[in-house]
Amino acid sequence: MGRLSKLSRRELLVRAAAGAAATTVAVAGGNLVAGSPLANAAAQATSSGDLILANGKFVDGRGQVATTLTIRNGRIVTVGTAAALAPDARTIDLGGRTVVPGLFDAHVHYTRAGVNPGYEARRIERAFSIAELQEAIAERAKSVPPGQFITCIGGWNHTQFAEARRPTKAELDAAAPRHPVYISGTGGGTGAITNALGTAFFESKGVMVETRTGVVTSAPAGLAALQGSQTPDGKLRGTADLNAHANSLGLTGVVNAGNLDDQELALRLWREDKLTIRMRPLFSADSPQDVEARVRNNFSQSGRAVGDDLFRVAGFGERIGGTDTMSPQFEPTARMIAKHGWLLQQHSITTKENDFHLEAFRSIAREYPIDKLRWSIIHLQSIDEARLKTLKDLGAGASAQTWTYFSIAGGPPFRRIVDSGIRAGVGTDSTNVSALDPWLSLFYMTTGRNVAGMLTNDGQQISRIEALRLYTEGAAWFSFDDHHVGSFVEGKYADLAVLSHDYLTVPEQTIRKIESVLTLVGGKVVHATSPFSAYRA
């Protein structure tokens, strides 16, 4: 079955790093600031046309709710019946296909993945044999100029393949004979591998490659060599490519923990009317002074979120008070965030960390109404019922991540979290320590089986509907978006995905192969494939 270590998240990060609407927003002096002109309706990915989606199976966190949906000006007008629309309204016959709300990742390092070097073949995340990996690379090669690198940095592990081994140099050559290839995995034992053309590049940069296997002996050096040849336009293209990939899986919203430079690329796409995913940036803060500087330079002084419903500043996270998760600076920094009325997400894995952060939350709640601010602790690998109750009583939320799909350690306790009744959502924490693909996470949440097929989270499985709710309306709660997206309710944005398979009835293993054949963000088509290719924007 290969080797999947019982790695901590820190170990996964170390190894992966080695292998790896109020006002609108403008860029000035390296900061996101209020004040640029309002973008047009297309920038918000909405459509001014009327649309009827008929003969579908609309499923959200409540179960199946309708067979027909009517959309006007990007929002849901009716659920279950067709409203009277303009004469030029379009009707799309869904042919009985299952439709879910657009998936929402409650915590992801999204823009960091967008700036990975090369042309990423992220479909490798859902390859379950060497042949499928080769197919993913060969398919990506069709749209990549010859001589340009095809990559996939993080988000996969060799134990997901039926052969339970790394691909060979020869197998990568066969998949992409005209392109250099560099792929590096997440978790133990996978490392980084390249092909013949890639070997020539790395050796020219002084990076050693094992001649027979194609294993890059120093993955950090290999990644640095690739990053050294990146251009700003290449990073922008990579971010747009990632958006297209996400849309193809039905992912339409993310709470993004990224650095300022990377987030500005998403901002640039938004300003050019090319952003196709709802982006909710988080900002770090090491001290109370950092909070005040962020509020002054990056946020609205009024306490209203800067941006529109497509690109909008969310708040602060994931590490408050510095990289030390139990820093003495945590409470005063978090208190300043509460004073200014902003959302907070805090990295909190262990029981010791949970207790530290909960005590600070309790103290701050005596002075400020954090129950109105959507505060949360994230990761929660082994949180118990008592601590969940404390968090719930504070009006805060529990955001669980699925990076243990790549481990034998198990967790988070999804069943316990759902049963507690707390506001809860899920995210991937990808791509260094996990896969971006939401269907792999939904598989893990409902089966308890990891990337290698081992039962590692037994007793904490949840139903498919419960998992869907955590990945839609539940996740959207963490950025104040649950009133706008995440379920099929009149007045909400028409963010949705028409699926390739019926999520509720397919065999467990097939969940990992589900994708979207038609994705809408605010009623606008952002992804379409057969049989809906004619609707492609």
Regions found by a protein language model. Give the residues of each.
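His/Asp/Glu-enriched, well-ordered alpha-helical/loop segment
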Residues: 237, 335-345, 352-375, 379-380, ...
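Extracellular/periplasmic ectodomains of large secreted or surface enzymes and adhesion receptors
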Residues: 529-537
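N-terminal secretory signal peptides
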Residues: 1-11, 20-21, 25-26, 34-35
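C-terminal segment of N-terminal export signals and the immediately downstream linker at the start
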Residues: 28-62, 72-75
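Non-cysteine beta-strand/loop elements that form the S-adenosyl-L-methionine
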Residues: 308-319, 396-404
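Acidic (Asp/Glu)-rich catalytic clusters
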Residues: 270-272, 299-308, 391-393
